[in-house]
Regions:
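Short beta-rich binding modules
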Residues: 1-131
Length: 131
């Protein structure tokens, strides 16, 4: 699935009072919650300064959308090699996040002006898979 990437300026155009912050992805966890139909949840704790945000991606809540998001994140952050990568081995990954109204709205490559906007990713996902 083709995921749209945006520049920082383009993301600022989508959200009022947006602010970019340097951050660290502490780790990536996928949890299957044993109630409400065995919901799959993606948990990616992100540290911004002294604050740890435990689940800014709460709208990513199905097995397929978790996979699509992880693939988009790996492509964005240029994680991986020919042998694959164990998600459990990933930690302390530098990134940039854009926050608007105390909500993480986009994540970006630390070295490049490239961001994934969660709202756009979910819209693209729903158009492709929830017809």
């Amino acid at each position: 699935m083709k995921v749209n990437c945006f520049t920082e300026l383009e993301v600022y155009g989508k959200f009022q009072s947006a602010e970019t912050k340097n951050a660290i992805i502490e780790k990536i966890d996928i949890d299957v919650i044993g109630h409400f139909g065995n919901v799959t949840m993606l948990d990616i704790p992100i540290r911004i300064g002294d604050c740890l945000y435990s689940n800014p991606f709460s709208s990513i809540s199905s097995t397929l959308s978790c996979g699509v998001f992880i693939q988009a994140l790996f492509n964005l952050l240029e994680i991986g090699d020919d042998n694959g990568v164990k998600i459990s081995s990933l930690n302390k990954i530098p990134c940039r996040v854009i926050v608007s109204d105390n909500k993480t709205v986009a994540i970006g490559n630390f070295m490049k002006n490239k961001f994934i906007v969660f709202e756009d990713l979910l819209k693209t996902f729903n158009e492709k898979f929830n017809k």
